[in-house]
UniProtKB/Swiss-Prot annotation:
Compartments where found: Membrane
Chief location bin: membrane
Protein's UniProt name: Probable sugar phosphate/phosphate translocator At5g05820
Highest taxon, organism lineage: Eukaryota
Keyword terms: Membrane, Sugar transport, Transmembrane, Transmembrane helix, Transport
Organism in which the protein naturally occurs: Arabidopsis thaliana
Length: 309
């Protein structure tokens, strides 16, 4: 009985950490890029990936949280590098969109990931779902169209960046299923991050130097005036790793259905918290649109589950 209670408390603690890190990194990204005025999304993403590289190594090589899996061939390495590139694009574009859009609208667009996943799965693998499953994607897309029309802080460039980030996130999940499908090449998410994050740093470094010139000098100058920026960046980067760690642990300690429900609720919680903190204007139309999208995502998940059974 005591073991079961302890296990329940451990799972609740994990879920709370998962929610806190996910919502925390999202809100802090928004604060830094928009409110604080640190307008360097590529450099910010590079900080995240550097932290993920270092902390992944500590967690796997030193703390032995999961067994270390090795890359077995050059082909597997190039597959991971391709995934890393798509991963970079999704995170950078997502951070760019946060400069221009409120978190609430950003989350509404992000909820359309299943739509893009279904599209890419069909285009790349010819994998067809039941018609009912595709039908449930109609409210997902319709909701975002309605939310866009009713969004007081709508920004076209931010909207396009967010759509691109969402599409890239879906593309990564489909690509991962294709590229690392054989038993010999499968990596758990912790090991995949261990290899993807350093590749991401290598890809982001030239992009940062070319597109965000003298960002290191600007950050150092900024730190001289306000040292809090250093703590913000360090905490934000550590949170970015914690998102991946808690996501892995929650996936391992809960059922697929629980994870689905928690994932759908997480976006809604992020929306409410962001509105309370940033006090961005919201419209009834926008909230109705977002609600319709969330309902569509829940129906889509349910339809996919029934189709499997």
């Amino acid at each position: 009985m005591k073991m079961a209670t302890n296990g329940r408390f451990f799972t609740i603690g994990l879920v709370a950490s998962w929610y806190s890190s996910n919502i925390g990194v999202l809100l802090l990204n928004k604060y830094l890029l928009s409110n604080y005025g640190f307008k360097y999304p590529i450099f910010l993403t590079m900080c995240h990936m550097t932290a993920c590289s270092l902390l992944s190594y500590v967690a796997i090589a030193w703390l032995k949280m999961v067994p270390m899996q090795t890359i077995r061939s050059r082909v597997q390495f190039f597959k991971i590098a391709a995934l890393s590139l798509v991963f970079c694009v999704s995170v950078v574009f997502g951070n760019i969109s946060l400069r221009f859009l409120p978190v609430s609208f950003n989350q509404a667009i992000g909820a359309t990931t299943p739509f893009f996943t279904a599209v890419f799965a069909y285009l790349m693998t010819r994998k067809k779902e039941a018609w009912l499953t595709y039908f449930t994607l109609v409210p997902v897309v319709t909701g975002v169209v309605i939310a866009s029309g009713g969004e007081p802080s709508f920004h076209l460039f931010g909207f396009l960046m967010c759509i691109a980030a969402t599409a890239a996130r879906a593309l990564k999940s489909v690509l991962q299923g294709i590229l690392l499908s054989s038993e010999g090449e499968k990596l758990n998410s912790m090991n995949l991050l261990l290899y993807m994050a350093p590749i991401a740093v290598v890809l982001l470094l030239p992009a940062t130097l070319i597109m965000e010139k003298n960002v290191v000098g600007i950050t150092i100058a900024l730190a001289r005036d306000d040292f809090r920026i250093v703590w913000y960046l360090l905490f934000n980067s550590a949170l970015a790793y914690l998102v991946n760690l808690t996501n892995f642990l929650v996936t391992n300690h809960t059922s697929a259905l629980t994870l689905q429900v928690l994932g759908n609720a997480k976006g809604a919680v992020a929306v409410v918290v962001s509105i309370l903190i940033f006090k961005n204007p919201v419209s009834v139309t926008g909230m109705l649109g977002y609600s319709l999208t969330v309902c569509g995502v829940i129906l889509y998940s349910e339809a996919k589950k029934r189709n499997k059974n």
